[in-house]
Amino acid sequence: MSSSYWAVVPAAGVGKRMEADIPKQYLPLMGKTVIEHTLARLLQHPRIQAVVVAVSSEDRWWSERLFQDNERIIRVTGGAERCHSVRNGLESLMALAAPEDWVLVHDAARPCLRKEDIDRLIETLHDHPMGGLLALPISDTVKRADAEGSVMETVDRKGLWRAMTPQMFPLAKLYNSLREAIAAGVQVTDEASAMEWAGFSPRLIEGYSDNIKITHPQDLAQAEVFLKRQERGE
């Protein structure tokens, strides 16, 4: 019996670095909001059963969104931090999916995700014991700075990767690892870090560099460039 695939999108953040009046996932991008592009990329993939979206209890923008009546969208209440929102999303899936089903956790502010990246995750990890994540090898020179912003050292970039999403893991393993890490007070910055804390070694899978996370105002213009290139088949 083959496993099913589900997605969780934490979307309860406020995106303070965007210097905008609304959360970055609701900013306009080519006639839609950022999160509409993101959810569409996931919903268009034939292997994904449904998408759980974790939004803030004080979110006043979601109710106006195009996807509010989509039966493949499951809305849950997010938490104080990203890890809490993901945990809440996984908890809702535990009642719907099999423990061995796969879950792809994807940032709401990554609207340029390609189908090929999802395909690569599924094809590479479907028989992997603990899962993995999209990532990019670091090619730039990396500096470590002090509190004043002065360079302390140049970091050897050999073996360093920049983590991206989706990050794909077996549902029960991720849920238990994340829940226990949070309870232990571990700083969990992504799903892979929770799995690492639990003793697993996630697989790194090189993804497309245009799968950017919108963090700063200039990222919106860059995302539009990438989306238009993708529309042209580039």
UniProtKB/Swiss-Prot annotation:
Site (Positions MEP for the nucleophilic attack): 157, 213
Signal sequence region: none
Segments forming a coiled coil: none
GO-annotated biological processes: isopentenyl diphosphate biosynthetic process, methylerythritol 4-phosphate pathway
Reaction catalysis annotation: 2-C-methyl-D-erythritol 4-phosphate + CTP + H(+) = 4-CDP-2-C-methyl-D-erythritol + diphosphate
Pathway: Isoprenoid biosynthesis; isopentenyl diphosphate biosynthesis via DXP pathway; isopentenyl diphosphate from 1-deoxy-D-xylulose 5-phosphate: step 2/6
PROSITE patterns: ISPD
Site (Transition state stabilizer): 17, 24
Keywords (A to Z) from UniProt: Isoprene biosynthesis, Nucleotidyltransferase, Transferase
EC category: transferase
Entry's Gene Ontology molecular function annotations: 2-C-methyl-D-erythritol 4-phosphate cytidylyltransferase activity
Its job: Catalyzes the formation of 4-diphosphocytidyl-2-C-methyl-D-erythritol from CTP and 2-C-methyl-D-erythritol 4-phosphate (MEP).
Family stated for the protein in its record: Belongs to the IspD/TarI cytidylyltransferase family. IspD subfamily.
PANTHER family to which the protein is assigned, alphabetical: 2-C-METHYL-D-ERYTHRITOL 4-PHOSPHATE CYTIDYLYLTRANSFERASE, CHLOROPLASTIC
Protein name per its UniProtKB record: 2-C-methyl-D-erythritol 4-phosphate cytidylyltransferase
Source species taxonomy: Bacteria, Pseudomonadati, Pseudomonadota, Gammaproteobacteria, Chromatiales
